Each structure stands twice: as structure tokens, then as C-alpha cells.
């Protein structure tokens, strides 16, 4: 109500001295979000990828191509070629039954060999367990090691989704999930030290994260002084599948889960259905998504904002009220607003709010501004990016506390950038900025 009264009072006075010169309106520009590229347009779920000597290799859960389909490419973006079955003989005949060979992970060993960990159907129990195989080429053939699974806690529902992690000090581990979902129990993501090129276990199990829901497909990354544990959640069979993460200063925890998931169908504006099974490789992330009943493979650029991940094309939210304010103020208890606070009274010639945002690579992005406009006509803010005028943001009428979005194209540098909204036409409150 107070915001409406302010607008009415200013309109009644009609004194030019009370109003700043309006920003010259600029046409709303076409959205420039760059979404992950589809690089394998057929079933290729639960991907694992790495680069060696200028060639990229990728592996997937079993499909019509074989037990462990393998593909290669000259770059992460392709073109990708399916090369066949990396484990043509199938999983270990001593304990596994072919048909459910899931979530492969291949690691290039220092001695020039390669180790594959895989999930397979445990014949004796009907559960899934983790096996290991080795090869002298990334294309295979991988030959199973031993007549028993490497990890198989049947009392916990079995084990799936092993992924190799090598710490900065050279210590090698597997991160994996006990499949509690298969027996109606909670699931935990575990960390286990390995030896002999990852073919044997060398220590006990450390519990990382536990969930009564679905938590799977772990991928552990060390950035600076912190660890990031990526995982998938939600049902993998539809667009509700997602990728999130947790951080910790040490492998023993405590782990803090991100406030919002990193990648969802919604954060990609439905350009990917159920982004999950993520594999982070430096400044790239490989992820699968549903297309006409199959899970296709995508790749996206990743930036690391103070060692936190930013995926190009996936929306990242910055609360406007956490930015730098000049001659405007934060309004608390804003009904329906993100985090309950907004920036108000950007009403004067020297009023502005500025937020720092992170871009994984240099290029075009879409800036979505959450706003409410009760002025009675279209309002605007001037748009200044890294100190340079990039036009304006227009805000159609919504009414106060009715939060909507207005989107414009911006050009950003790789790394941190500043986005400043300045006084324009009429009056608008700003809830948040989302960069995509």
C-alpha cells in the first residue's frame, strides 16, 4: 500500500524536479541463453567421459549397442562416433548376469592401462553390485577382474554408480551408492579408498550423504580448499530427474547441500528433460536427458565462481537485495518475493542497484529480472553491464507484489561481471536477477 501511495503522490504533484530524466527506451532483445549441446542423439545414459591425448571418450549404461557402449570425439562438443562395446564379453561370469550393466566409470591409470568400474546384476541375490575390469586401450576390450564383485553390501540393497575420485594428494577412491531404494531403506553415498589401479579396496567406507529419497550418480570434485559432491535426485524415468551438489571442507564432512539444485528441467527452460547422471570434467559437464523415450547425451560449459559451479544455460539466481544499493532501499516482508525481500525506491536520478554475476565463458546470456510494477503503465530501468550502457529493461504492468520476469540479452565476459539497474521510466521493485 505504501508503494502505491508514493506513486499516487508523485503523480498528483507532477513536479519535474521530483522525477529523473527517463532512460531512452531500448527494444527488448532476443534471449541469448546457450543451452547444452546434444552430442549423441541416441540412447546414451549415465555418461562417463574423459580426454586423453586430444581425444575424448565417453561411456554409457548398456543399450542396444552393447554392455558398455563407448564413443569418441576430437573435442567435447564432437563430432562423436559410437565405437562399439568397450566390454564385449560382458560383466564377470563368476557373479554377474548380463542385461543390467549400468553407470560405467573409466579411469586412465599412470601405467598406461585403464580401469572400468561398472554396476551389474548379482546372480545370487538379484541385486545390483559393483565390479571392476581392466584394458590396455580406452576403447577396450575391458576384461573383468576376479570372480566376485568389488563392492556388494546386500544388507543395504546392493551397490551402484561407482565413480573414481583422485584427491590432490594422489589418494584414489571410489564414491558409490548403496541401493537402499531397492529395499525400501535410505540410500547413502559412500567413499572407499582403493589400491592397485582401483581394482582392490584399501580401507573402510566413509558415509558422505544419506537420503530417504533418491540420491544417486555421485561425482566428487576437489576445487581449492573444498570438495563438491554432485548427485542426481528425483525419479530418473521422467523430467523430474535433476542434478544437485553438496560442499564440504573435508572428506569427512560436514556436507552442506546447495540451496537450489544446479540443473533441472526448469533451470534449462525445458530444453533438457531430466538432466541427470552428470559427469564433471574440468570446465565441461556431460549429462543425459530424455528425448522420445531415450536418454541422449549433452555437454555444457562449466565455470567455477569462487570454486562453486555455474553451468551455462542453467539459470542462476542472484537476490537483488544482496547487491550494492545507492539511494534506494531493501523492502522486507515482500509478499511472494524470493527470499521475502526486494529492492524498492529506485526512484531518483542517482538510484541504482548493482549485482555481481558469473559467466562460465565470454558471450551472450539471457538476464531475467524478477520484478513487480504497480505504476499503471510500462516502466523501465537503465541497464549497465561492466560500466557500459546496454540499453534498458522494460517492465509491463503487474501490480505491486505480483512478481513476474522481464528478460533481455546481455553480453558478458568470462568470470565475474557487474549488472547495474538504474532509474528509468516510472517505478518498479526488483526481486532478483537470474542469469542463463
Question: Where in the sequence are the language-model features?
Answer:
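Secretory targeting and sorting signals
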Residues: 1-27
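Low-complexity, intrinsically disordered short peptide segments enriched in small/polar/basic residues
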Residues: 4, 20, 31, 36-37, ...
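Intrinsically disordered, low-complexity regions enriched in Ser/Pro/Gly/Gln/His and often acidic
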Residues: 10, 14-15, 20, 49, ...
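Carbohydrate-active catalytic/glycan-binding domains of CAZyme proteins
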Residues: 28-329, 366-370
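Extracytoplasmic
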Residues: 312-436
